[in-house]
A protein has these predicted regions:
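Polyanion-binding surfaces on beta-sheet-dominated domains and ring/shell assemblies
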Residues: 1-162
Length: 162
């Protein structure tokens, strides 16, 4: 039988509260029509399907958790044609929280930014899936195609944040 210390109980309680506050903030942003194009995008354009931008997810993660969580990326596969990246979130004192996996096809000659900048786009998508997995906002998880359509503006937003 595992015995949970008072410190672990307190940390878990605080983590649950931070996750709850993060969800509340993201739901508020999704419901705000003025945040269209800034915090979320409609996919397909003009539809009622609202998807949070990765830059928004990262900002809320930083605002709610400060520096208590570690977001790491690991290249799982990288060759001439494609890249697969896994992002993981863990607590700074240890303990896995969530993960996200993304795959992108490469073509440096393509006019498609997703293929030209496959590693950057793949990492952005993996981050988004990882953070959304932790905060679990909405009723679905974006498909690769949906993420592809929204990642281009995310890349520019993340550059502004970092």
């Amino acid at each position: 039988m595992d015995i949970v210390s008072a410190e672990e109980k307190l940390r878990d309680s605080l983590l649950q509260e931070q996750i709850s506050q993060g969800r509340i903030e993201l739901i508020r942003l999704l419901q705000n029509d003025k945040e269209s194009g800034k915090s979320w995008v409609a996919i397909p354009k003009g539809s009622s399907n609202r998807y949070l931008k990765v830059a928004t997810l990262k900002r809320v993660l930083r605002d709610k958790f400060n520096h208590t969580l570690i977001l790491e990326s690991k290249i799982k596969h990288d060759d001439m044609n494609r890249v697969i990246i896994e992002a993981t979130l863990s607590h700074k004192n240890g303990g896995f929280l969530s993960s996200g996996l993304a795959e992108r096809w490469k073509d440096s000659q393509s006019s498609n930014v997703q293929k030209q900048r496959a590693i950057e786009c793949c990492q952005t998508a993996a981050w988004g899936r990882c953070i959304k997995s932790l905060l679990a906002v909405g009723y679905d998880i974006s498909t690769a195609d949906e993420i592809d359509r929204s990642t281009v503006s995310d890349i520019n937003d993340i550059k502004e944040i970092n």
